[in-house]
Amino acid sequence: MVGGTVVGDLQVLYQPDRPELGYLPEGPIGCGSGEISWVAIQHGPEQDVGSLNVLDPAAGFNRHVELPGRPGFAFPTDDPDVFLVGVERNVCRVHLGSGECEPVSDEVDGGVENTIINDGVEIDEGLVFGCKDLAFDDFKAGLYFWRAADRRVFQLRDDQLCSNGKVVRRDGTGWWIWDIDSPTKVVVRYRLDPASGTLSDPDTALDLTHLPFFPDGMVEGRTPSTVI
């Protein structure tokens, strides 16, 4: 069933005082302590590096960690000093204190060029994340499941252009995943089996092709039947 859309108001939560941090911000993710993690994908049009950031909105204080590449997402872990970050083509453990960036996955999108990790979402068993074609030209970027227990990466799709927004909900032993490939203007739904690392065929959950703009992100709404 194709849903409808509702328009709401927005307000600025935080404006970085460094222009490089405001060039391509992505996220944010709540850390459970009142803080928010977010990434600056790259620090300018000619840059190929970005940063992990942890914001305390109440204090207006932002911690900043330079990364050796361009990040697509950052999620907190049980260790408050460690975040799981998608950097270029690897899932990495990044330490806030030292800035160490340790790959914990094989490289993704190995069969194609000019793609990087762009967006992800946490599930109990690990991460589901997608990539984007930097030229926004070829539908060649992958969608992946990284399983934390054995650090194994499963390729779920290899035909996306810019994977850019995900919502997940538990369904028995698996997960329903809602995903946007931005240029298609369509939200699709799959069922992920984390034990086998397989994805069902997609069905259309929300058709936005009638709108003049492209969807650039998606998060869970306040009720089970809505997304933002």
Predicted regions and their residues:
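A short helix->beta-strand "capping" segment at the edge of beta-propeller domains
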Residues: 2-22, 55-60, 66, 105, ...
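Beta-rich, blade/repeat-based domains predominating
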Residues: 20-34, 68-83, 110-128, 157-175, ...
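Recurrent small/Gly-Pro-centered beta-turn motifs in extracellular repeat architectures
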Residues: 40-41, 86-88, 131-132, 179-181
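Short, solvent-exposed loop/turn segments at conserved positions within beta-propeller repeat blades
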Residues: 43-49, 134-141, 180-185
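A short loop-to-beta-strand structural motif that recurs across blades of beta-propeller domains
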Residues: 49-53, 90-92, 141-144, 186-188
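Beta-propeller fold detector
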Residues: 63-67, 102-108, 154-158, 198-207
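Short loop/turn segments immediately following beta-strands, especially the blade-tip
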Residues: 96-97, 190-198
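Hydrophobic alpha-helical segments and helix pairs
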Residues: 99-156
